[in-house]
Amino acid sequence: MAGQAFRKFLPLFDRVLVERSAAETVTKGGIMLPEKSQGKVLQATVVAVGSGGKGKSGEIEPVSVKVGDKVLLPEYGGTKVVLDDKDYFLFRDSDILGKYVD
């Protein structure tokens, strides 16, 4: 997974640090997919979360995901963060489209 790299970075407020899942490079039938046809990876694993953001009433609202959750991301957005030569992405909690439930 993310190893120790994410421990060097703590998201603030309602920010969520995620590690995108690897794109499928081979079909179930064993056909290798070229990079152009793989599509954008929209699934990720949460590796760190902030403490939450201020709500309308001024109270701190906790982030809706926790470390280890599998989430669905928007096609565009997020801020790329490189930690120990590995790419992570920083999103606002409200930008995350949903989380996968086992």
Swiss-Prot record:
It is found in: Mitochondrion matrix. The keyword Mitochondrion applies. CDD domains: cpn10. One of its GO terms (cellular component) is mitochondrial matrix. The modification N-acetylalanine is found at residue 2. The modification N6-succinyllysine is found at residues 28, 40, 54, 56, 66, 70, 80, 86. The modification N6-acetyllysine is found at residues 8, 40, 56, 66, 70, 80, 86, 99. The modification Phosphoserine is found at residue 57. One of its GO terms (molecular function) is protein-folding chaperone binding. The modification Phosphothreonine is found at residue 79. Transmembrane segments: none annotated. Its main location: mitochondrion. Induction: By stress. Coiled coil: none annotated. The modification N6-malonyllysine is found at residues 40, 54, 56. HAMAP family: CH10. Co-chaperonin implicated in mitochondrial protein import and macromolecular assembly. Together with Hsp60, facilitates the correct folding of imported proteins. May also prevent misfolding and promote the refolding and proper assembly of unfolded polypeptides generated under stress conditions in the mitochondrial matrix. The functional units of these chaperonins consist of heptameric rings of the large subunit Hsp60, which function as a back-to-back double ring. Homoheptamer arranged in a ring structure. 2 heptameric Hsp10 rings interact with a Hsp60 tetradecamer in the structure of a back-to-back double heptameric ring to form the symmetrical football complex. This is 10 kDa heat shock protein, mitochondrial.
